[in-house]
């Protein structure tokens, strides 16, 4: 019969004509010559359904629906050409890697690119393109020779010449490596071309070709051979005018028109007659009795075009972001199914950005209980088995890095080997917390002989291990043993392996030891039981794919020497190519596809998603090995490669046309106002085109979230989604906004059909929830707090910062995950302990602090840090070179502070009487400060004071408190007033209260001071002598705080002070006596008033805590907020937007006014 064409524009039912003809042939002669219906891969399933689903042709041994690759497999199976080993993408890339590594000499163009990630992938794509377009190394060599003949080569021509030189070498070597043994996907078609003549099933067969718009040269060669052996070839093309031989490149049908004329030419050259084409009428296809769609199809690419007046079943939607878009479309689909009697298979969603829409559609449509099939292969990359393989290689390669180890464990594929301490997800989390806190970061630390120790750093004088720590130590070591048992063997084998075969065997044996096939089978059964057969099938596919990958690597490069790092890269490249093959889970489902890949028919309603500028049509990328200019240069010299980006963009317009004309009954188009990151997006020009053709579509419908949607009835859908929408609507009502009456009917339905105590009841009850914690019941308080509460002053400061912060930290004992790092509190403890020891050593050695030299200060600092660093935070200062440097800098800070303290001591008549002075515990010199509370509880304060100094004046004893701080700090009386700075004055109160028993004499307050331990930097405007520098540095250590307003006492703190400002304390004396106003001073009665105020705050906090008071009441003072560094925000959920959540804002009160407040408070309490 020869060749014939079935031609017609979109919607003319070309496929139906072919199917009808095939059915007729099967019916007439069921066992006649073969019929092959060749379609693209993604079209085979739906055409099989279309051909064999009716009762007349529910099966056939004569007709087969195949793709080109499936036809090749079928023919090679018959003729014996299928004996060669198939090589996949990973095998090709391994072969290319080997070719590159074995090349002698330099490269002309690829030298820098060879080591870049993705180069092998680009190279593979280039070779595939060359094969697909039947370009041989000789063809490239001719192009290179032609370019070399140019006397004056442009830079582009020079670059292309060098690329061709490298490419010829690689291509020739690659073909030689494949020859006789391997075959890739492109070679399969080449073998098919060679074997068609020997195939009996193709002899005298009827061939039908559908769903293609163009063919590669290789596919054209297949068709040429089919023409010579088959009885007939029928090709369906989307084309309007077959007689137009010189169609413009801007013509909508340029691509299929070129295809039509190329196939005619091939038939003529093969001596095959070509029948007159069958041209189908647009008005007799899908658009019969649908003039609006006929108008769309006819004028889609015509300008000017008449407008279609009147209402049309075409709607344009806009959405604020992709989630709102998909949510709105799911509601539209549900409405079509529920109210318009559509079947799921009547509906299609067409997209351009799978990475944006696939997960959203799958999740949201599942919520709406809408069966959906996404016509796209999914990568296996995120399957637990793949994660296990990739992570174990990172473990070995990264010397047992923690993140890699725990990725291995969290796959759930490492079995427990200890019944008493099983390796569950909870225990894995505990183990992870341990290794992060204790700095376990290497293979040596994991597999070393020493047992892990569990003992937290709680200060330099707290060294005993608790019972709980001993229990945790036992469990951590038992978990560790199981990890070592699971990983150590494969680690050793992978390190010892030298060839690809050894590496693959080590991996395979490890997976078998873990019984991965059995574990995957259990997972498959679980998914089958859950009604998720697709997920079940994935378990089989992923194991088969991994084994095939290992087999291929061994087959291609088994004896090749390969480092583990190179093997890891090669295996990763192979893994990235692995994909799940899915078939539709049912005959009735919504189809989701991309417009350039999917082939759809019999679609009643089509949704086009994300119709935005730059996406519809899509700007093509041009990042290949041969760029755009070089492709044009080759084409001008007669070598045709794949289309340029300009041609791709023009062809994309043809795919737009197909998408906009695919539906029979309804077309719904949506575009985004912003992307998932909130960036503004513009609608595609196609939106304006539709508005021009159909003025009735200009009023766009906004797809919004439930709480903003005016048409709320659309949200009455499934039980799950309706409950979510109902909650949003009732929340609006609660805020005073009107809602649609239908929601009260929905609410009543849930009340009647869902039991109390169930999920729905709890969700609706949540509408009445206020973020206000309830006070603790009496029995709870008694369980949390003993009758005699021992508390530090900082704990009570926390209470005044925020009651809930105190509750979370001290009552519930919540804490952040501890990490192996040196925090500010750790540095502060080091400073305190170092300065204490240095002072003790100086006194013990009979030296005078005031006579200390810089050299001595440095010596003492080095001695202190050397002694303390092994105890500090699990020896963190010994863990790395970085921390060794930090240790050196900390020594310098301590040395400088020690020297300055000596200089201050030389000018002071105050001397230390207590260092790191503890109070409140039985072994301490000073008893606790105890307060009986009115509710029967006793508040017992305990703590540790950095330093207490004493001096005597006129037979009176004066005490001052000095606190060492690693950051600059002063005494803010506002903070004292509100209770968030109690510590210094409380400590002063403690030592004054117990001074007679402690020191044998009742003492008076001299002041409270903060000493900033640091190594300051100074800025100089001009040259400075060493003495000037020392003087400026000394000023930087001026202490801040509050002093007794007694000139003699202040002079005893700075004997050099006669008039002016002191360089040691925050006071300044006038010439004629008295203090300057900026001095930080208070008289004796004020100190007593402050002492009384502190007492009241401490008692008040104790009463509130023991009464069970818990409030979310963080303070705010200027720019400071209790929430800023609070780790418990995820627990309290404080939100100032909520009516019930407000900051306690501290008034900004002047210091004099504060002192008056303190005095009035003292009078009232007195």
Swiss-Prot record:
Cofactor(s) recorded in Swiss-Prot or TrEMBL: Mg(2+); [4Fe-4S] cluster
EC number in record: 3.1.-.-
GO MF term list: 4 iron, 4 sulfur cluster binding; 5'-3' exonuclease activity; ATP binding; double-stranded DNA binding; helicase activity; metal ion binding
Binding-site residues for ATP, renumbered to this chain: 8-15
SUPFAM superfamilies linked: P-loop containing nucleoside triphosphate hydrolases
Segments forming domain UvrD-like helicase C-terminal: 283-588
Ranges of residues in domain UvrD-like helicase ATP-binding: 1-290
Gene Ontology process terms (BP): double-strand break repair via homologous recombination
Pfam families given in the database record: ADDB_N (PF21445), PDDEXK_1 (PF12705)
InterPro entries: ADDB_N (IPR049035), DNA_helicase_suAddB (IPR014140), DNA_helicase_UvrD-like_C (IPR014017), P-loop_NTPase (IPR027417), PDDEXK-like_dom_sf (IPR011604), PDDEXK_AddAB-type (IPR038726)
Cofactor notes: Binds 1 [4Fe-4S] cluster.
Binding site for [4Fe-4S] cluster: 802, 1123, 1126, 1132
Quaternary structure (record): Heterodimer of AddA and AddB.
Cited function: The heterodimer acts as both an ATP-dependent DNA helicase and an ATP-dependent, dual-direction single-stranded exonuclease. Recognizes the chi site generating a DNA molecule suitable for the initiation of homologous recombination. The AddB subunit has 5' -> 3' nuclease activity but not helicase activity.
Family, per entry: Belongs to the helicase family. AddB/RexB type 1 subfamily.
More about this protein: Despite having conserved helicase domains, this subunit does not have helicase activity.
NCBIfam families to which the protein is assigned, alphabetical: addB_Gpos
Stated name of the protein: ATP-dependent helicase/deoxyribonuclease subunit B
